């Protein structure tokens, strides 16, 4: 019987990455970010442990979607009160709270348990081009979301 390798938690190196979301496709960007948060890009990935890195997303207000999703994709939230369902299109939510779009997409790609909540805290999303995490010396991460494109 094979045993699952357990890396010592103190030996884990947690890197910080910064991702520019300008003109990136939302779903493809979110899936790459979720893989980094989980640590699936590392050799010592363990499914039930937090082995991932921190990710900073800048320019979330410039994220792109294809087709008619800008006007037809709906985001729903509920206040908890009777009749409290609110519905908003992608375009309106992008004007009001652009960070929430990226957060919602990434959160849906993480595990639905306490580990997923812990992983989600390592995601930092900002609408503009600046972020307050310069002290962590984040590395630039270029994610290609358009198949066949070089940018």
From Swiss-Prot:
The keyword Ribonucleoprotein applies. One of its GO terms (molecular function) is structural constituent of ribosome. CDD domains: Ribosomal_L13 (cd00392). One of its GO terms (cellular component) is cytosolic large ribosomal subunit. The keyword Nucleotide-binding does not apply. Keywords: Ribonucleoprotein, Ribosomal protein. One of its GO terms (biological process) is negative regulation of translation. InterPro entries: Ribosomal_uL13 (IPR005822), Ribosomal_uL13_bac-type (IPR005823), Ribosomal_uL13_CS (IPR023563), Ribosomal_uL13_sf (IPR036899). It comes from the Bacteria. PANTHER family: LARGE RIBOSOMAL SUBUNIT PROTEIN UL13M (PTHR11545:SF2), RIBOSOMAL PROTEIN L13 (PTHR11545). Belongs to the universal ribosomal protein uL13 family. This protein is one of the early assembly proteins of the 50S ribosomal subunit, although it is not seen to bind rRNA by itself. It is important during the early stages of 50S assembly. Part of the 50S ribosomal subunit. HAMAP family: Ribosomal_uL13. This is Large ribosomal subunit protein uL13. It comes from Nostoc sp. (strain PCC 7120 / SAG 25.82 / UTEX 2576).
